[in-house]
A protein has these predicted regions:
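N-terminal Rossmann/SDR dinucleotide-binding element
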Residues: 1-75, 195
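Glycine-rich NAD(P)-binding loop of the Rossmann-fold in SDR/ketoreductase-type enzymes
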Residues: 35, 59, 75, 94-105, ...
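Hydrophobic/aromatic anchor residues within beta-strands of the central parallel beta-sheet
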Residues: 53, 95, 118, 171-174
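NAD(P)H-binding glycine-rich loop region in Rossmannoid oxidoreductase-like domains
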Residues: 58-98
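NAD(P)-cofactor binding segment of oxidoreductase domains
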Residues: 70, 90-119, 157
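Conserved Rossmann-fold NAD(P)-dependent oxidoreductase catalytic core, especially the SDR/UDP-sugar
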Residues: 78, 104-147, 165-167, 172
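A conserved pocket-lining segment of Rossmann-fold NAD(P)-dependent short-chain dehydrogenase/reductase
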Residues: 88, 141, 177-232
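Active-site Tyr-X1-5-Lys
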Residues: 129, 145-182, 201-209
């Protein structure tokens, strides 16, 4: 069984659905701070399966220990955490407390229960701003002044240091950026706030004539001076 933290969020729910489609059993934990039980209902509707779910804050290590003890967890995919660069500048303590404390609590619970397989969803933002072609070997830009980026850098360092203590650890870190799209049944997708900040929800609102235009303030070295972005479909 695979435990998916943040499994009712946009990325986590699609991960859970893909795992079930490939015959894997999943257990979802989520504190519902940025998700809804409606997503759980949709997962069960699409898959036709019962999906075990436990509402907990994974910073609560004793409660997380009980989940590991109750279910036969063999691996963890960590998709929980705060993810807004802009918001983190306004709420730095919340971002450090959530993103750093979550990974520490999760690793403690895994260590205690003997689970040693982890996929951690990090961010391409750990590199900071760079004009170079990115690679896994590139060092982090620790001087970039943003709490979200720093919290992800800290989380990766904690994971690496923990992995060095036991050769049984099998860990992969995925540095994601600009995840978009939705499941083909059109009943599972991104939770969009009333005032979205991501460009795809904004573009869809403009296309649906719910707003007049999208304001692009940044200038770039492109033909029309606007920023070019690459996107990764959530099912990829």
């Amino acid at each position: 069984m695979i435990l998916v933290t943040g499994g009712l969020g946009f990325i986590g729910s699609h991960i859970a659905l893909s795992l079930m489609a490939h015959g894997q059993e999943v257990i979802i934990v989520d504190n519902l701070s940025n998700a809804s039980l409606q997503t759980l209902e949709r997962l069960e509707f699409i898959s036709g399966m019962y999906v075990p779910f436990v509402k907990i804050d994974i910073r609560n290590t004793p409660a997380l220990n009980k989940v590991f003890e109750q279910y036969s967890v063999e691996a963890v995919i960590h998709a929980a955490g705060f993810k807004s660069i802009e918001e983190s500048a306004l709420k730095p303590l919340e971002y450090y407390n959530d993103n750093v404390s979550c990974i520490m609590s999760l690793l403690r619970a895994m260590q205690r229960t003997g689970v040693r397989t982890l996929i951690h969803l990090s961010s391409l933002a750990v590199y900071g701003q760079s004009s170079s072609t990115l690679s896994e070997e590139m060092p982090f830009n620790y001087s970039y002044p943003n709490p979200y980026i720093k919290s992800q850098q800290m989380a990766e360092e904690i994971i690496r240091d923990t992995a060095l203590t036991d050769s049984e650890w099998k860990i992969a870190i995925l540095r994601l950026s600009n995840i978009a799209g939705a499941f083909e049944h059109a009943v599972l997708g991104e939770f969009v706030a009333p005032l979205p900040k991501n460009i795809i929800p904004l573009a869809l609102q403009a296309a649906a004539k719910q707003r007049d235009y999208i304001e692009l303030r940044q200038q770039a070295h492109t033909l029309d001076r606007t920023v070019e972005r690459s996107f990764l479909h959530v099912l990829d």
